[in-house]
């Protein structure tokens, strides 16, 4: 039994190293709200919350690996592998999702974040979709921490979709150009009722779609 557990972990760590090597070949370009352009090495990472869709996770993981980031990963076998990969990139992982323990994981996240100066990266449409539709967890986190909540979208030229996942997860090709659009922070008040949370989740969904459209237009230009 120990061998069966250890082997996948070694493979996942190796995958993390390959993942980092892939990102080293990419031509990564960040597009900010004011139209200015940055590279991952010049982006001023801080105490912000990056909200993105699962489809962009492969494209963004290596970029976030340049910062000391924290993320939330759903339970399950896929989550186990993802945890090993994120850890190999230098990220900190808490396990949980919007279902089955997500409330507890979010509470732990909120307890741990005050002394953490690194960014928080949250997949907002998981664990089961629909793709591109934000849940309310990131909004709650922004309300309780006061951190800026930034919608992020990415696109790559001729990028293949991995498997048949609900999320349409895509993988950047080696040496390809990848554009990452970082949107304006979504204003989130510290006190939110359920209708307010749902309204802001809807606005976040709209902004994520806009970031995705901008990234696609830029990469195809």
Task: State the predicted function of each range.
Residues 1-27, 81-84, 88, 103, ...:
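Alpha-helical membrane-targeting segments
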């Amino acid at each position: 039994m120990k061998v069966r557990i250890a082997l996948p972990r070694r493979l996942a760590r190796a995958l993390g190293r390959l993942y980092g090597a892939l990102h080293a070949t990419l031509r990564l370009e960040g597009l900010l709200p004011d139209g200015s352009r940055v590279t991952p090495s010049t982006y001023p990472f801080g105490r912000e919350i990056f909200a993105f869709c699962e489809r962009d996770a492969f494209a963004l993981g290596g970029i976030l690996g340049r910062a000391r980031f924290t993320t939330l990963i759903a339970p399950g076998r896929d989550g186990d592998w993802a945890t090993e990969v994120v850890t190999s990139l230098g990220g900190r992982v808490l396990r949980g999702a919007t279902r089955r323990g997500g409330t507890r994981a979010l509470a732990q996240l909120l307890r741990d974040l005050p002394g953490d100066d690194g960014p928080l990266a949250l997949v907002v449409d998981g664990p089961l979709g629909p793709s591109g539709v934000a849940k309310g967890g990131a909004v709650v986190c922004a309300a309780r921490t006061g951190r800026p909540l930034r919608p992020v979208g990415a696109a790559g030229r001729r990028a293949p979709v991995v498997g048949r996942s609900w999320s349409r997860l895509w993988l950047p090709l080696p040496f390809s150009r990848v554009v990452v659009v970082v949107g304006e922070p979504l204003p989130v008040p510290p006190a939110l009722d359920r209708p307010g949370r749902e309204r802001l989740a809807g606005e976040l969904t709209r902004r994520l779609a806009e970031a995705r459209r901008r990234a696609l237009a830029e990469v195809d230009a």
